[in-house]
């Protein structure tokens, strides 16, 4: 029996795991305490990796559908020939742009497949490469690139105030949830949870049960408060941003009084969370994947 250090590849967090191998077979997975990010945590998906690897439903060989129904196993050479023949027919009849490629995730957990898909796309001369990002977090990446110049991450370890905006770390990012609990219990952090659901973490801080789909209105009203009460870090704004005067003018219409009936949040609470967020020396917002990305007002 041997224990190997590796990582879980079932989602983008890439948590560290210790894999127990017996007679050449994976028999158990558990968290890796010394891992700098996951710190010993793995979710139920990571814990059940052996079942995933040895599932009776896992495809280990290529199959093709028979004319009368059902599937028949073919060799890899046969499968590649069938794919090449059909792809050539499509290109000859409709052009190369008729092909769309879906490669699953393009994150770190699937980077090899994503890299190959990019090369195959170029070789076939089609621009159509799709991934789960289209129904996941691509909009967030684009928004941060347009706003900050690159895709940035949250510096939550040093934060004095965290807003969990539509995010419940206990679901699949427990190490973050545990860190927040520790800092809140030690009175080292202010916690605000903006979520229609009262999660376990929401019970530790200020819970704002927003009406679903009205997040943009709340964000605009918070900016209105921060700007008009002069709670802005002017040195940062002057040195690292563009368009602030235009933002000041634009934001005047989005008052807490305007946002309150839209969001279902009292005016006093909108002002309170804006002030808490602005007065902390180190604040960050951690948004949930999909909860905001897939809505026009997210």
Which residues does each PLM region occupy?
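N-terminal export/assembly segments and adjacent metallocofactor-ligating motifs
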Residues: 1-229, 266
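Short coil/turn segments at secondary-structure boundaries
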Residues: 94-104, 132-135, 234-240, 261-262, ...
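Active-site phosphate/pyrophosphate-binding segments
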Residues: 222, 241-298
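Membrane-interacting alpha-helical segments
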Residues: 225-243
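A general boundary/transition motif marking the beginning of the first structured unit of a protein
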Residues: 108, 210, 235, 239, ...
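Active-site-adjacent structural elements in folded domains
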Residues: 145-150, 237-246
